[in-house]
């Protein structure tokens, strides 16, 4: 092969390569034009579907293209980290943040609330102290000497221990036992048992509760019957007066109010006027029945007189026509 042939072959290959490159460029341009046409068609279709009110607003909302590489990198890093974290129990929670100004305002409100509560507590303490001082008494070793105001323990309320003369609460052992009086000598004050309330045993001269056996027996007077003639104390039925041969008043049984002797216990010396009088003794004279025809039926006392009637007149006389 000669040099001329080689040159011809080289030119032919170069021509083929150029033709191929030209065809490739032509295809690329055609593809780009097709993509542009498709994009325009899609945009036109989207524009047609967009309402007329938004078509004028969308161009105004379109901003400048963000081409800051630093901001893009930070956004990608933030997007890679999730805002939700997992605690020890495996539950997800979202972190919440508060502004520093809001936090300071919240702390200020809490401070004001605590100050108001402290003032209220101080006022209550002052009122309680004044109340204790007004009631009297005191706690030993207090700020005012222990003689007034303050809390008083049980031993200091009065009467506890047997050596105090103040009133107040006294336990059962100190109110008064068989010694009759507790811490006051045994003769007054304190709780007194039944045997000490008075009149029990027949040898005491005080009043109070006396059992049935001590209120008064046949001796007529209980603990006062021996030296006072049986007047005091409970008196049984036989001793209330008028029973038997006694001249005092009071309750008298039926047998003693007045019998046929006309006067009861006072009939013997008063002519039968006192006491209960039976029917036969209410009028003097004879009790014979007298008919209505008797002329003296209205004049003589002791006779039978019918009940007065208004139609006959108060003279209560019958006429011959009746």
UniProtKB/Swiss-Prot annotation:
Chain segments annotated as transmembrane: none
UniProt biased composition (Acidic residues): 64-75
UniProt region (Disordered), positions on chain: 1-94, 125-322
Biased composition (Basic and acidic residues): 141-227, 235-269, 277-295, 308-322
Compositional bias segments (type: Polar residues): 1-13, 32-50
Domain of life (superkingdom): Bacteria
Low complexity bias (residue ranges): 14-31
Cystines in this chain: none
Name of the featured protein: Uncharacterized protein DR_0269
UniProt source species: Deinococcus radiodurans (strain ATCC 13939 / DSM 20539 / JCM 16871 / CCUG 27074 / LMG 4051 / NBRC 15346 / NCIMB 9279 / VKM B-1422 / R1)
